[in-house]
């Protein structure tokens, strides 16, 4: 697992996907700090890593990245158990708030480079 604060190469994500799940890389994005953790077996592992580094839990959102779909809407999948947060109004594994989805998308687009 690693925390991405600057950029990560798409080729690195492709290697992670091949070594773990085949087509996807799990990631957790901190929308407050504009960083993400990648490469964990579970979103909860990445969430714990970011929490240990001082990220506030309410700003952490789990996604899946599909490197082969880079540049398309299918690159980011909003699906994680850590996203179920009734107190924040998010009752699904997805991210229901459009502003949060936009923030996650913007951060991922900034951090992942071809």
Task: Identify the residue ranges that each predicted region occupies.
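Short histidine-centered catalytic/ligand-binding loop motif
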Residues: 9-17, 86-97
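Negatively charged, low-complexity tracts enriched in Asp/Glu with abundant Ser/Thr
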Residues: 7-49
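Generic, well-ordered alpha-helical segments
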Residues: 23, 55-57, 70, 96, ...
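Well-ordered alpha/beta subsegment
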Residues: 93-114
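Amphipathic, interaction-prone secondary-structure segments
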Residues: 41-75
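Intrinsically disordered, low-complexity regulatory segments enriched in Ser/Thr/Pro
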Residues: 67-95
